[in-house]
């Protein structure tokens, strides 16, 4: 009987944690494959020369550059494979963390795990591109916190979710679109006939503003009041000389080959 109980405990432990371990390590499968001379190298160059890089691009993806510069100071952070490992582990931690949270709250954990594996398999950009991935990590965290806030009526979590989404704007300005996550709050309030929806909205907005002010405050303190507006103006001005930065060009770049060769 004792042997069976011990075997059941071991089986339960493996059943619980092996899927988590796979999600954690799966992004490492290609860390030693090839050399990327495009976005991967561009991002690593920004981290390595963060203190002397062009201010426009430093501020355009500020929090991503700060995190990348910090990772590059870790052991082997001055090597390509070392940075691949560190940044890929961030992806794995995010996926494993999301799975651990969702399997406790949703049915069919196997389907959740398969969905996480599919999402990891579709990550096309190099993991060192933190200006993309850090925004994804923050959005994932915000969604999980917001889900907890909605299902448990936790006002603090509304604020925390807002803070996380505000920080995401410091990663890259287009992440301001993540503010659309207020729509599920309103939809859930409509479904549950929640009369406190307006207060919850204010909690979210307050947290969002607070999260937004943190990176902006650091930028203003270090680079001056005009630094961020000048960066925005410079980025918008690039569409005059670099047509591939226009929104229409970016959209056509995604679908151009399909249209051309279909």
Q: Can you name each region flagged by the protein language model?
A:
Residues 28-46, 55-71, 77-78, 223-224, ...:
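Extracytoplasmic catalytic/substrate-binding loops of multi-pass membrane glycan-assembly enzymes
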Residues 52-56, 67-86, 94, 106, ...:
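Juxtamembrane segments of multi-pass membrane glycosylation machinery
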Residues 103-106, 142-158, 195:
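Membrane-interface transmembrane helices that cradle and orient dolichyl/undecaprenyl
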Residues 123, 145, 157-175, 179-184, ...:
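Membrane-interface alpha helices of multi-pass inner-membrane proteins
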